UniProtKB/Swiss-Prot annotation:
Its EC number is 2.1.2.11. It comes from Leptospira borgpetersenii serovar Hardjo-bovis (strain JB197). This is 3-methyl-2-oxobutanoate hydroxymethyltransferase. Homodecamer; pentamer of dimers. Its main location: cytoplasm. Belongs to the PanB family. The gene is panB.
């Protein structure tokens, strides 16, 4: 278990950016374990990226526990944050405590992430902190509320909505969240929130002035050739690399070139 106060220290504001990557499986987690990346998020975005659903809503707590266990095996020394999925904490404080407790006990993760900034969510964050469960907040485009937003749209564009987001960010910080993800909001709002809250902000489509950034590993590696939101920079083109490798394998099997003597007993 990594030291939360070392990795997510507010003293890093303006000094050292935090790098976070979202991962769902053992093989990629093992690679991440060999890198200097600061933290791994096991996101309920696995519902879309890994399962092929149109949203994160179908993901269950059991599925999140399974994937978080797998990622922990691959990256035993990384600071791992696990999403609590839709309806695993919104129905009551008691349900939120049970879900967060299960996640921590059964996966050996270091923290949980929950979406929203309502009074209910802030109360849950405060209680979880009191019982020893670190919580990362999530504001802006919160995918579990995608139907309320009318799709995956930039949030906080108007004066009223930006003021509301800022109030919620301050409330989350004061309730005990150790960090807040800001997703798909104007860069200027991302800067303002980062300046006004006392904890580190982690942006995804929230501009360069957040205290850190998070991207889904599959996305930054370019595994999906058709996925290109404005906030995404692809640092590789694994779609073409994987496709070329599979086509080469297919051709060598057909021709009889593989397996050769080097691959035979």
């Amino acid at each position: 278990m990594k030291n939360i106060h070392k990795i997510f220290s507010p003293e890093k504001k303006g000094k050292e950016k935090i790098s976070v990557v979202t991962c769902y499986d053992f093989s990629f987690a093992r690679i991440l374990g060999e890198t200097p990346i600061d933290s791994i998020l096991v996101g309920d975005s696995l519902g879309m990226v890994f399962q092929g659903n149109s949203s994160t809503l179908p993901v269950t707590l059991e599925e999140m526990i399974y994937h978080t266990k797998v990622v922990r095996r691959g990256a035993p020394d990384k600071f791992i944050i696990a999403d609590l999925p839709f309806l695993s904490y919104q129905t009551s404080i008691e349900e939120g405590i049970r879900s967060a407790g299960r996640m921590m006990k059964e996966t050996d993760c270091d923290a949980v992430k929950i979406e929203g900034g309502s009074d209910f969510i802030c109360e849950l964050v405060a209680i979880l902190k009191q019982i020893g469960i670190p919580v990362m907040g999530h504001l802006g485009l919160t995918p579990q509320s995608v139907h309320v937003f009318g799709g995956h749209r930039v949030q906080g564009k108007g004066e009223e909505s930006s003021a509301k987001l800022l109030r919620e960010a301050v409330a989350l910080s004061e309730s005990g969240a150790f960090s807040i993800v800001l997703e798909m909001i104007p860069a200027e709002l991302g800067k303002r929130v980062s300046e006004e809250v006392g904890v580190l902000t982690i942006g995804i489509g929230a501009g360069p002035d957040c205290d850190g950034q998070v991207l889904v590993l599959n996305d930054l590696l370019g595994l999906d050739a058709n996925f290109q939101p404005k906030f995404l920079k692809k640092f590789s083109n694994l779609h073409s690399i994987v496709k070329d490798a599979i086509e080469s394998y297919h051709e060598e099997v057909r021709s009889g070139e593989f397996p050769g003597k080097d691959h035979s007993f």
